[in-house]
UniProtKB/Swiss-Prot annotation:
Main location group: virion
Subunit architecture: Interacts with gH. Interacts with UL148.
Compositionally skewed regions (Low complexity) per UniProt: 47-114
Name of the protein: Uncharacterized protein UL116
Native organism: Human cytomegalovirus (strain AD169)
Subcellular localization: Virion; Host endoplasmic reticulum
């Protein structure tokens, strides 16, 4: 019995030690867990209460200048549509220059062949009339000038207008004497003095009538000639229409070729004149005026005159 009790005592003692050890381990585990949780809480607090530093604001000012190009285009009393001829142009707005070759460049300056330039095809100008009284032709208050077609904007167009032959019509060209040189907006070369002697003007006939009698077939690339004469009578022809304006492309007449045109506007009609017939027409005018140089600029040579009227027969 004593052995059993002693043996039981020895068995209970390790069991008691084992229980105490287990409690100690549980206590230690609890302690470790608490400590870890506290540490985590502390770390979170530190992160939350950290100091935040804000750098000062920087202000930057940028100044931008925007330049908007402005295009001003004005054509009074004109309603137009455009078509083209195959020449190259550069536009010069509001500038009148006279070069060494005595050519005037206003609005459009023809240079070399290739891209196209638009020209006026339909015009509705202000009213104008020509009246004959006792053989003297006078104009109304409004007289069309060479500047009627100056401010046409150059654009590209796909087609070329058909050329017509002036010699296929009976026509007259009427030159009016200029009353005031200041009213003619034509640039004259400063190196070439202007004619100021009225006696020289009196030697010319005013008005001058030219007639062309041509009944023939017309071929675009064949240079036909026509006979021009000066009419001695100054009686106007009421059924014939007055031309409002005449312009030339290119403007330097010395470059007349199959690609050049004269644009003649009468009311709401427009004629495109082939340069071959135009050359003969100008030759007749120059011969009567005593101008020998056919390559001289048409606008400059006609500076003493108010207007050129070409009257085709209807």
């Amino acid at each position: 019995m004593k052995r059993r009790r002693r043996w039981r005592g020895w068995l209970l003692f390790p069991a008691l030690c084992f229980c105490l050890l287990c409690e100690a381990v549980e206590t230690n585990a609890t302690t470790v867990t608490s400590t870890t949780a506290a540490a985590a809480t502390t770390n979170t607090t530190v992160a939350t209460t950290g100091t935040t530093t804000t750098s000062p604001n920087v202000t930057s000012t940028t100044s931008n200048t925007v330049t908007t190009p402005t295009t001003v285009s004005s054509v009074s009393n004109l309603t137009s549509s455009t078509t083209s001829i195959p020449i190259s142009t550069s536009t010069v707005s509001g500038t009148r220059n006279t070069g060494n070759n005595n050519t005037t460049t206003i609005g459009t300056n023809a240079t070399s062949p290739s891209p196209s330039v638009s020209i006026l095809t339909t015009v509705t100008p202000a009213a104008t009339s020509t009246i004959s009284v006792d053989g003297v032709v006078t104009a109304s208050d409004y007289t069309p000038t060479f500047d009627d077609l100056e401010n046409i904007t150059t654009t590209r167009a796909p087609t070329r207008p058909p050329a017509q032959d002036l010699c296929s019509h009976n026509l007259s060209i009427i030159l009016y004497e200029e009353e005031s040189q200041s009213s003619v907006d034509i640039a004259v070369d400063e190196e070439e003095p202007e004619l100021e002697d009225d006696d020289e003007y009196d030697e010319l006939w005013f008005p001058l009538y030219f007639e062309a009698e041509c009944n023939r077939n017309y071929t675009l690339h064949v240079n036909h000639s026509c006979d021009y004469s000066v009419r001695q009578s100054s009686v106007s022809f009421p059924p014939w229409r007055d031309i409002d304006s005449v312009t030339f492309v290119p403007r330097n007449l010395s470059n007349c070729s199959a690609h050049g045109l004269a644009v003649i506007v009468a009311g709401n009609q427009t004629w495109y004149v082939n340069p071959f017939s135009l050359a003969h027409l100008l030759d007749a005018i120059y011969n009567v005026l005593g101008i020998e140089d056919l390559s001289a600029n048409f606008r400059r040579q006609l500076a003493p005159y108010r207007h050129t009227l070409i009257v085709p027969q209807t």
